């Protein structure tokens, strides 16, 4: 028995509608890929320095916030464990995004509440202030560095989900090792400014200002607008290869890479290695070896010499 004409027409219309939806989806995908060069957002990757293959991929926005949290912590003299706790907390609370909303009046990276004395809305939305407040509370907890991460974080945050921080510990550990400089050449970003391809013109003065904002005035960067560069002196000694100033240099260098998209940074050089925006491989490949003397002109770890981190902005 043939189907009624009404049902036939309805089926035909449904098929046409479904085809139109598929075509629209394909067209949207193609447009996004064309506009972004195949990637919706600039990305960053941090890799383990232990050779275990562990890695964590995140966005340029998250990289900027993570670098700020780490810089504020080390500038306060907090150990790497404190930075790990802070990063895991921010990953859980906000996904490392400086959000203007949350549960009740919670705001910012750590979802701090003005009504509970964390500061004003404007203060809490400042990542440097928010990180400083978190570390100030963490430092008051006796033996926090020996506590399980989720316990230490919960004593600061007093969250309704006290066990939730633990799941972020592996990623936070990778980030902290890299951003504190202990794991050298372990972080890379593609360096594309959000919403476009390539590296747009940058301003060395903006880079200098951001460095001082995150690390404090002691970082002493020197901006050279004519050469589009910022140079940060890192005093080096024989012992620095095992930590100390050498670790500080990598902290500054990987901070710069984390801020590449936001500040339109094109190249970062330190300790005989150079990172260039546009590299999409892993960190080991992105930080290429340069001359034996390194871009600063001083041999790595040479006694009495002064190494430097050199940051070049896009033109």
Q: Which positions does each model-derived feature cover?
A:
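Substrate-binding/active-site groove segments that recognize
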Residues: 104-119
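A charged, amphipathic interaction segment
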Residues: 144-206, 264, 268
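C-terminal soluble interaction/assembly domains
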Residues: 250-266
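Alpha-helical segment that forms one wall of the substrate-binding/catalytic cleft
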Residues: 94-96, 116-164
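Flexible, glycine-rich surface segments
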Residues: 187-251
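Short, functionally critical alpha-helical segments immediately adjacent to catalytic or ligand/cofactor-binding
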Residues: 69-70, 80-95, 156-157
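N-terminal export signals and maturation junctions of secreted/periplasmic proteins
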Residues: 1-71, 182-185
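Extracellularly exposed regions in secreted/surface proteins, prominently low-complexity, repeat-rich
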Residues: 176-178, 261, 268-315
């Amino acid at each position: 028995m043939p189907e009624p004409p009404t049902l036939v027409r309805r089926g035909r219309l449904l098929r046409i509608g479904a085809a139109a939806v598929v075509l629209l989806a394909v067209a949207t995908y193609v447009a996004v890929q064309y506009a972004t060069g195949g990637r919706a957002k600039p990305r960053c990757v941090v890799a383990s320095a232990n050779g275990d293959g562990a890695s964590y991929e995140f966005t340029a926005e998250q990289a900027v916030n993570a670098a700020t949290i780490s810089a504020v912590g080390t500038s306060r003299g907090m150990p790497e464990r404190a930075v790990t706790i802070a990063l895991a907390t921010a990953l859980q609370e906000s996904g490392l995004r400086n959000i203007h909303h949350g549960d009740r009046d919670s705001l910012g990276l750590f979802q701090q509440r003005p009504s509970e004395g964390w500061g004003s809305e404007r203060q809490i939305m400042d990542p440097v202030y928010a990180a400083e407040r978190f570390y100030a509370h963490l430092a008051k907890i006796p033996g926090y560095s020996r506590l399980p991460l989720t316990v230490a974080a919960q004593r600061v945050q007093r969250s309704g989900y006290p066990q939730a921080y633990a799941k972020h510990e592996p990623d936070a550990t990778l980030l902290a090792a890299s951003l504190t400089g202990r794991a050298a050449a372990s972080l890379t970003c593609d360096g594309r400014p959000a919403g476009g391809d390539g590296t747009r013109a940058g301003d060395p003065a903006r880079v200098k200002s951001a460095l001082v904002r995150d690390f404090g005035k002691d970082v002493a960067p020197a901006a050279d607008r004519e050469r589009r560069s910022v140079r940060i002196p890192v005093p080096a000694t024989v012992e620095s290869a095992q930590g100390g100033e050498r670790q500080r240099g990598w902290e500054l260098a990987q901070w710069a890479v984390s801020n590449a998209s936001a500040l339109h940074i094109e190249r970062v050089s330190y300790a005989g290695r150079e990172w260039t925006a546009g590299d999409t491989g892993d960190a080991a490949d992105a930080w290429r070896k340069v001359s034996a003397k390194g871009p600063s002109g001083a041999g790595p770890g040479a006694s009495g010499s002064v190494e430097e981190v050199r940051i070049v902005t896009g033109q």
